[in-house]
Amino acid sequence: MKKKVSTLLFILAPAMIFGQHTFSIVAIDSITKEVGSAGATCGDALMWPGTPGAVLISDIIPGLGAIHTQSYWNEQNQDHAHEKLVEGYTAEEIINWLIYNDAEDNPSVRQYGAITLINESIKSSAFTGENCFDYKNHILGDNYAIQGNILLGQSILDSMESRFLNTPGSLSDKLMASLQGAKVIGADTRCYDDQVSSLSAFLRVANSDDSPNDLYIDIIVEATPDFIDPIDVIQEEFNNLNLSLEDYSIRNSEPQLLCIIDILGREVSNRKTGQLLFYVYDNGIVEKKIAK
């Protein structure tokens, strides 16, 4: 049986003080329409009992976009962001709505990053409240938004952007590289004494036909032992799943619809010729094919 990549990693670590979310990126692949979300923070599931750590901020709606609600995370704000994303608001419209309708009437402490896909048009937007903890900022590109607070400095965000833009391959490759760009001791300054960038992290990618609760790639590190960087744990899992698609190419300039039939003769999917077909089997074997 073929399955999507979904990994949840929880490694016991001692409880630590409460903190806020730190650096993250949301992005859309303009060709495949994949939606991606990745980030990390110097907080974990033990620090915030009952939560999955950094991934708390991430909301992906396959085929529509993603939004991160970070810095003084508020569940009601995130629920509203989700609703507006489903309703077809653009990234900027979602964030503007959140600013003017903050659940606690205090948008100055919030930070948001959003990316949307509406009628083939990708829009990105971000907001950094003036009362977020320094260093704080965000960067926007045509198909991505990068944001962070409690950072070592602007260099963390710049490195994330550079890695994202200059790494070849799939959206997941670029997001993984972007996280690595922030893997600096004390990237979240609260983690400097721990000699890591952060304590929990995530990397998520959705195909346009995925369910929001069943994403194509969903790697979550809720917590790690002392002195183990969660970005390294994600990288190891990413490598184990053989998700590097550096040789990806579209072989046909004019793709045609391809009907995929299972062994019983039932139509199970439609793909375009030239599209990469990527399968992960229960036994761990990875198979990559180009539809012809």
State each model region's role.
Residues 1-21, 245:
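Bacterial Sec-dependent N-terminal signal peptides
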Residues 20-242:
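N-terminal nucleophile
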Residues 242-268:
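Residue-level detector of functionally pivotal "anchor" positions at catalytic/ligand-binding pockets or at interdomain
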Residues 29, 116-119, 262, 270, ...:
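Acidic surface patches and DE-rich sequence motifs
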Residues 22, 255, 274:
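Short coil/loop residues immediately preceding or within conserved phosphate-binding loops
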Residues 276-292:
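C-terminal tail/sorting-segment detector
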Residues 32-34, 121-123, 246, 266, ...:
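Residue-level signal for well-ordered, solvent-exposed loop/turn and beta-edge residues enriched
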Residues 39-40, 128-129, 270-272, 290-291:
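Short clusters of small/polar residues that mark proteolytic maturation junctions
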